[in-house]
Amino acid sequence: MPTPALLQVRVGQHSDAGRKSVNQDFHGACLPDGPQRQSKGVAVVLADGIGSSDVSDVAAAAAVHALLVDYYCTSDAWSVKRSAQCVVAATNSWLHAQTRRSPYRFDQDRGYVCTLSALIVKGATAHLFHVGDTRIYRVQGRTLEQLTEDHRVCMTDGRSYLGRALGVQPQTEIDYRSLPVDAGDMFVLSTDGVHEHMPPGAIVQAIATHAPDLDAAARSIVQQALENGSPDNCTVQIVAIDRVAPADASEMQHQRAQLRLPPVLSARQQFEGYEIVRELYTSHRSHVYLATEPGTGRQVVIKTPSIDRQEDQAFLDRFVLEEWIARRIDSPHVLR
């Protein structure tokens, strides 16, 4: 059985208190080696304490530490989503309890409250967890695509306040999304002290200028935000995906659930970059086609599930497992 390639990720990060005496931002990353990277992936976490509280820096540090430590202690049988959400939910409850036991129990704006944004990359999938107004971006060409929603409530006079954060209530809603990643993809996590004073194009330009030194790029972004007049703490993290690992069985099933079943194919039809030559086999379970790669003429065989089984989720999961198993077979008697 061939040894699967491990996920390779680089992380650059920097934080500065700026004009404030205390840095209420907190950030961290965990890039484990070997089996743990394969089973749990790489985690990058950012939290921002609220300015009205003198203990929100404690909350931010606790939130980051909890996710970076406790996530890796959850069962390998759990999905990334279940593992991280359980940890964040427990942290939220703990922070809320700390406020209830403190002198600030009647004024939550002075309690153990912070925002949180986390990026966990496992295999070939990025998982995003988010509460508050810190942000996660994906670098898209010369600009940034914002992947998270700011949980802020805007008032008629133009002011706004934080609408959701960790520690405010005993339970909180945690935004989650996942997306496929590939080698060359890059993500940026930032606190509002940065993204409210740095246009997306300037962030991308700083990364390009200092490449491949991501720490230098992060320092440059923070410094520019402060020079642009940011009055807040400034923190940025840059995540570069250098190599993705093959998806495990649970990831492939998760990805499968987001795809539509292909229709019945016919000769000369284009499908996923190939041209169908003819049908080789058909049954109530699946269809098998001979196809060629335009430009090279290379022949391939494509197998698709029958549309008659599109509601049979268990069958579709088993269908996906065929590819997962085939990748792990290394035999001269098996066609690859």
Question: Residues of each region from the PLM?
Answer:
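PP2C/PPM-type serine/threonine phosphatase catalytic domain
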Residues: M1-V301, P305-L321, R328-P332
